[in-house]
Amino acid sequence: MFDGWAPFTVYAYYSCSPAGITEEEARAAAEGTLTAKQSMAVELEMLLGLLRGASYGAQAQATDLGNFAVVDALAVLCGGYHQLNGDGQGLILVGISTGTLLATNGSIERVSGRFVAPCGCPVVLSAALDNLASFPAPELYHLGATKVMAGPAFDLGVHVSSVNDRTLIVERTFGVAWTCDPVMTSAPAITPAV
């Protein structure tokens, strides 16, 4: 199913008392937890993959285009991406705080429910990018056409512990691929106004 992709698995669990809830209800709760957390888990895996050099079908690590003001960084990514790849497909990945700043000053705009850069590329606001402590300053990434494949959710069974709790674990495997070498840039740290 994930031939040529870099697969990874996301897990979720639900713990409860064995009395008062059926196994089907516990399974539904565990699957609901998985659904709620899987998008951030996929974002985080993509970002960590960029940091550690995991290959997602293209160059392992992003080419660093330099440090710029946030608005200039967006322009550099748009221009650099078209210069390097030229196919006009892909996405720009920014943290929510950086995306909010870009949206507030009109550098990105919402079109049909999604954010778009002036170069026409979709902009994805990533909570995972804001939450990575290893980033000293906001970083912006441009990836080629990106595909995420999700497998079915699997139930790993019910475990009843010695304290009379029941835990149901579910998992789903994902694969991520993009079609060209990623590029990135960083901006000075965003500090809140006093």
Question: PLM features: what roles do these ranges have?
Answer:
Residues A54-P122:
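Extended, solvent-exposed, turn-rich assembly/linker loops in the middle of proteins
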Residues S112-V194:
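Sequence/fold signature of self-assembling virion shell proteins
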Residues L44-L51, L65, L74-L77, L84, ...:
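Generic detector of leucine side chains in alpha-helical contexts
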